[in-house]
Amino acid sequence: MARFVAVALLVLLSLSGLETIQHAPKIQVYSRHPAENGKPNFLNCYVSGFHPSDIEVDLLKNGKKIEKVEHSDLSFSKDWSFYLLYYTEFTPNEKDEYACRVSHVTFSTPKTVKWDRNM
């Protein structure tokens, strides 16, 4: 029993140190299918490799927050960093600009990554 308590305490102590680790998120913005003007598609913002888990992600159209956005559950990798996918249906055209804005403790100000229709 004492051995179990010692091992459990060691595990808890090692995990408690994870909160002090900070990793900036990697942000990727892309469409599900190649962009075609006037053809419905999905805009994706994949945010990965970040720690701690507190994060705010917004998809933007012409600099304004898109309200109807869905996202995956918060998940973590083998290295205990987190990842998320935010997505929404959209219809690309030549005049509108789309982006993903991320706020995280590792950024002094929110970081915005624009969607490149040629990627």
From Swiss-Prot:
Main location: secreted
Keywords: Disulfide bond, Immunity, Immunoglobulin domain, MHC I, Secreted, Signal
PANTHER family noted in UniProt: BETA-2-MICROGLOBULIN (PTHR19944:SF62), MHC CLASS II-RELATED (PTHR19944)
SUPFAM superfamilies assigned: Immunoglobulin
Keyword Lipid metabolism applies: no
Keyword Disulfide bond: yes
Function noted in UniProt: Component of the class I major histocompatibility complex (MHC). Involved in the presentation of peptide antigens to the immune system.
Compartment(s) of residence: Secreted
Superkingdom of source: Eukaryota
Assembly and oligomerization: Heterodimer of an alpha chain and a beta chain. Beta-2-microglobulin is the beta-chain of major histocompatibility complex class I molecules.
Disulphide connectivity of cysteines: C45-C100
GO CC annotation terms, alphabetical: extracellular region; MHC class I protein complex
Protein name: Beta-2-microglobulin
Pfam families: C1-set
Domain Ig-like C1-type per the UniProt entry, residue ranges: 25-114
Family: Belongs to the beta-2-microglobulin family.
Gene3D superfamilies xrefs: Immunoglobulins
Gene: B2M
Signal peptide: 1-20
GO BP annotations listed: antigen processing and presentation of peptide antigen via MHC class I; immune response
